[in-house]
Amino acid sequence: MKRPDYRTLQALDAVIRERGFERAAQKLCITQSAVSQRIKQLENLFGQPLLVRTVPPRPTEQGQKLLALLHQVELLEEEWLGNDNGVDTPLLLSLAVNADSLATWLLPALKPVLADLPIRLNLQVEDETRTQERLRRGEVVGAVSIQPQPLPSCLVDQLGALDYLFVASKAFAERYFPNGVTRSALLKAPAVAFDHLDDMHQAFLQQNFDLSPGSVPCHIVNSSEAFVQLARQGTTCCMIPHLQIEKELASGELIDLTPGLLQRRMLFWHRFAPESRTMRKVTDALLSYGRQVLRQDSFIGQ
């Protein structure tokens, strides 16, 4: 059985995390040549490339498996050794989360964990349709995803759903929808998407108004909080989680443009198995809080 030296695995991990050999060398306090040598040792051991040497570098499929192994070992070492290993540096937990969860329920859910445990969070924001891929690649140890099926050697639990409403300011509605929300009016109403792969707005309009994808003008803004600001100032109409705009809806600052119509996205918590003690506490915190504030019934659509 091929057993990698974990020092060489840490070099591979540093190159991926730091997005290059030079910064990885600085992080590890060794020379860039030493980083290259350690990775070459790994590649010789396994007889195949572990890095695609692009800018930034990315792991091959075998590299992804080794990174996942490293992260599991680090968590299990923490469980067995605890604070007896003489290292005062808080444990780094890399998690892949969607922007809307981060803007609404995730941080309150993690509050007791952050208060009780010596950990450092590395929250990597990604669309909920793609967070599981970061777990597959070994970039993170846990992911909030819409995928219900676990990856091999992983665990999954249902967290609950976010309900998305199609909202805008009253002034925006009066300007663009004076006769109600119609297909022709929607074609002229500015909207917003998180990135070019975010299809929630388009999917909602296609499902409920038979509008083809790409037919509605969309701003691209990589911020969940900015969606709320854009809607409040009357710039766009957009899909926003109900949980994020309860006060604005109650005050009338924002209005639901299509009462009775919504998008429900069920979220699931994925992580490696077996769980370390720390990850078990993270899981318990996320499941407990998520089940308090997220919808638990079956989702309506994606």
Curated annotation (Swiss-Prot):
Any idea where the HTH lysR-type domain is? 4-60
Q: DNA-binding region at which residues?
A: 21-40
Any one GO BP annotation for this protein: regulation of DNA-templated transcription
* Keywords in alphabetical order: DNA-binding, Transcription, Transcription regulation
Q: Which InterPro entries match?
A: ArgP (IPR017685), ArgP_gammaproteobact (IPR023490), LTTR (IPR050176), LysR_subst-bd (IPR005119), Tscrpt_reg_HTH_LysR (IPR000847), WH-like_DNA-bd_sf (IPR036388), WH_DNA-bd_sf (IPR036390)
State one Pfam family annotation.
HTH_1
**Molecular function as annotated in GO:** DNA binding; DNA-binding transcription factor activity
Give the record's family classification.
Belongs to the LysR transcriptional regulatory family.
- What does this gene product do? Controls the transcription of genes involved in arginine and lysine metabolism.
Q: Quaternary state and partners of this protein?
A: Homodimer.
Q: What is this protein called?
A: HTH-type transcriptional regulator ArgP
State the organism of origin: Yersinia pestis
Organism classification: Bacteria, Pseudomonadati, Pseudomonadota, Gammaproteobacteria, Enterobacterales
